[in-house]
Amino acid sequence: MTDLSQHTPMMQQYFKLKHQHPDQLMFYRMGDFYELFYEDAKKAAKLLDITLTARGQSGGKAIPMAGIPFHSAEGYLAKLVKLGESVAICEQIGDPATSKGPVERQVVRIITPGTVSDEALLDERRDNLLAAILGDERLFGLAVLDITSGRFSVQEIKGWETLLAELERLNPAELLIPDDWPQGLPAEKRRGVRRRAPWDFDRDSAHKSLCQQFGTQDLKGFGCQNLTLAIGAAGCLLAYAKETQRTALPHLRSLRHDRLDDTVILDGASRRNLELDINLSGGRENTLQSVVDRCQTAMASRLMSRWLNRPLRDRAVLEARQESIACLLERYRFENLQPQLKEIGDLERILARIGLRNARPRDLARLRDALAALPDLQNAMTELEAPHLQALATTIGTYPELAELLAKAIIDNPPAVIRDGGVIKTGYDAELDELQALSENAGQFLMDLEAREKARTGLPNLKVGYNRIHGYFIELPRVQAEQAPADYIRRQTLKGAERFITPELKAFEDKALSAQSRALAREKALYEELLERLIGHLAPLQDSASALAELDVLANLAERALNLDLNRPRFVEHTCLHIEQGRHPVVEQVLETPFVANDLALDADTRMLVITGPNMGGKSTYMRQTALIVLLAHIGSFVPAARCELSLVDRIFTRIGSSDDLAGGRSTFMVEMSETANILHNATDKSLVLMDEVGRGTSTFDGLSLAWAAAEDLARTRAFTLFATHYFELTVLPESQPAVANVHLNATEHNERIVFLHHVLPGPASQSYGLAVAQLAGVPSPVIQRAREHLKRLETTSLPHEVPSQQSGKPASPMQSDLFASLPHPVIDELSRINPDDISPRQALDLLYAWKMRV
């Protein structure tokens, strides 16, 4: 630590506080500004684009300094948090008027990306999560906390691959890991990783602190007593939350045990490819959520996002949601609920801020309005006969006493902060009313007092006045001073007058001179009392908020079902996936022409479709719409299809699109093969697999061989598979794999122009129309013409491929050496496979010229 003796007392105070928070930017309150010093100032000036100055000296050197007005700090804090920075807020807690030396200061709060709760610093439509992990490469404990809602969950996960997929789903703003873990682990590639002391993860301490937080003897009631790794991680999260918030956390009331087996698992690549709530460009436009989310409240939109990213495999839960949506669709009942739900607002985060004791006056006003809306909402729910909706109505309840309390306490349109008062309603507290009246009506009181005293004493020259030194007084001319009543106490003698004070005026003075500051202090005390009273009701209010969010999502899904023409899917026990007139919910919304719906049939006999057809013909759309229909069914939603019958799936895999990973040193082909390997290792006979153009990132024979082998492996696994390819050779797979069938997307050519019909038809495609697509894309005509010449020659010289045989369980000899073998010249390879008796003299001559050019 710096030698403090060379510094000014104020800077000594700063260094002591900064030493306790070396990793955070310190906002150091000085009057109306938050100041930053030294390296903090330099960093903040760069990040916030504010002026860096050097004012004064301490320790013989100029002090680098940057400052921001405290009343506009929110905008700067929001920017810093978005950039991943943490900020320690250091406030003046002493009174400058009475302080000897520097005003006493202390850090009252630490704002970090994962623990921020201020409305202005959060994205209202996304969860803001804090996570911690503990374990080794075989088994990990994962704990996740949303401090803005109170949701706190744990789970144990096997292996890095599954853990990283779960972290990608959760996308925590901060991730805590033990400091004794080796450097360079896969988890450290994520943003917001913080290393914490190993003892923060101590399981015994964690168990004790968690039981203390929840008021329980043990954790058996939460179903996680034996999850020792996850409990250690949860204890670290709880300690970190308390350290940053500097207050009790009454809104953290329970621990939920999440199980991956209860969900449909999507890996990171599948989540990205399906564009559930984030598109491939990182935005929200044209995502599944952008189409299916018309929720009335932000908390419901966040719940919808959680549902989309964590589909369920619990048939009872899914069918209860379906039944609820059907009930809300009857007689358009959702239309009665949605306007009332809009009045509820973001109750979930409001209650969390109340629990953290940093709720703003407008939070309480919104809570007041929400509670006032509940009785009408309850009345509207009485006719909803679906059991799940009835359970939600019971949980929601009403809170007439709290509604009345807030209606009496908070003015209609309160200011943003309590700092300057003006929040508590007149009539709520007699003492506050009196103090405010004194402050606001001092002039009128003095005029009334003067009139009364003139009448009482009969002295017409009597005056009531005030000066800053002597305070309030009654002044009489010297000649009338002797006639002053006995209760007049002499205060000051002037040349031509005497000044007096009376007990009544003295009492008024005591009140009036401090009325404004006392009124503000009283108002703040009443506000704190109000928060404490609300905290006493936090548990049922939070349960109500959760139920309201779910009701909002279900009403939204009913509205979407009506307006997007969605229908109820049916879950069955036997293995199948039948879709009639299925549509892509997102593409359908952006098309200016009607979307071409298509069928799909997979069952015990047919487990894989090999899909061929032209580029832009709709293969990827067809595959993605299938995955989205299955996913929507697994959140309990209705689906974009005339009819859908399906069995539960355990995973959805997608290998679609191409991109490299330059930062990770992986080529496009390596990324493609990594994703393919993940699918081949983890797909089961209950999985849905989408494979698009596997093998296109390498040479033709390598790519074809890999695609062929991958398709055969998936056929043996019996996963539901849609395998789109331009390798026409793969259309012979059904001959060796009975569970495989061919379908194609049709197109036609008219006047040398391609027309995509987008219909899925049985059998393989007759041609790929690649040159027509290239022409449509604007490739120059001479290039197209030359390509036709090459195509004609290649079609003449190429030979049909036979299905490689497999005997005695051994793989057939490859037609081409593997990537790392010494390759023969392609011409020699082709020559070795030609039977001269099978080709015409003209074909032989063409081949000879072609080989001559290539050699």
Curated annotation (Swiss-Prot):
Keyword Nucleotide-binding on entry: yes
Binding site for ATP: 613-620
Molecular functions per Gene Ontology: ATP binding; ATP-dependent DNA damage sensor activity; damaged DNA binding; mismatched DNA binding
Pfam families to which the protein is assigned, alphabetical: MutS_I, MutS_II, MutS_III, MutS_IV, MutS_V
Disulfide-bonded cysteines: none
TM region positions: none
Statement: the UniProt record of this protein carries the keyword DNA damage: yes
Comp. bias intervals (Polar residues): 796-816
Highest taxon of source: Bacteria
Protein family according to the UniProt entry: Belongs to the DNA mismatch repair MutS family.
Function: This protein is involved in the repair of mismatches in DNA. It is possible that it carries out the mismatch recognition step. This protein has a weak ATPase activity.
Protein name: DNA mismatch repair protein MutS
